[in-house]
């Protein structure tokens, strides 16, 4: 979904750095990646992963994704993995208030034709509230400006994660 639109000329956002898999994926595609996380462990793991791949086109930022507008104002793509960092403290989770603030800024900052991918893990405490908040937010985006799609499995148990995809059709 993102690889279809991101080129070596583009700047992109990894809103939830985590273990650095998405940052690495984006760094291979884009000119510049801005990656955010509130956990030092995430920054270190990601720095190591990028170094092993020989990539240096990512700015790793120890801050919440809601601060992204302090670092850049327009970009081609953004990715979120909502939930918690699997190998870390499971009480440190993404929260609806900061996630919605970040999503608003992403919708403003996306270039025309730009895309955002939001993977929602919600089987943990607080996850259901964030899931509902995100779905409510994206369902209210104006259809003249955005296309929003949902990709989910329907025959899996135990709260399987699902993907929300946003494409910006035009500037305001």
Per-range role (PLM):
Residues 19-31:
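Conserved SAM-binding loop of SAM-dependent methyltransferases across substrates and taxa
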Residues 127-172:
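Class I S-adenosyl-L-methionine
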Residues 109, 113-120:
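Conserved beta-strand signature within the Rossmann-like core of class I S-adenosyl-L-methionine
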Residues 83-101:
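Mobile active-site "lid"/loop adjacent to the S-adenosyl-L-methionine
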Residues 1-11, 21, 44-74:
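S-adenosyl-L-methionine
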Residues 7, 55, 110-112:
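Helix-to-beta-strand junctions that scaffold the AdoMet/dcAdoMet cofactor pocket
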Residues 32-37:
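Conserved SAM-binding motif I beta-strand of class I
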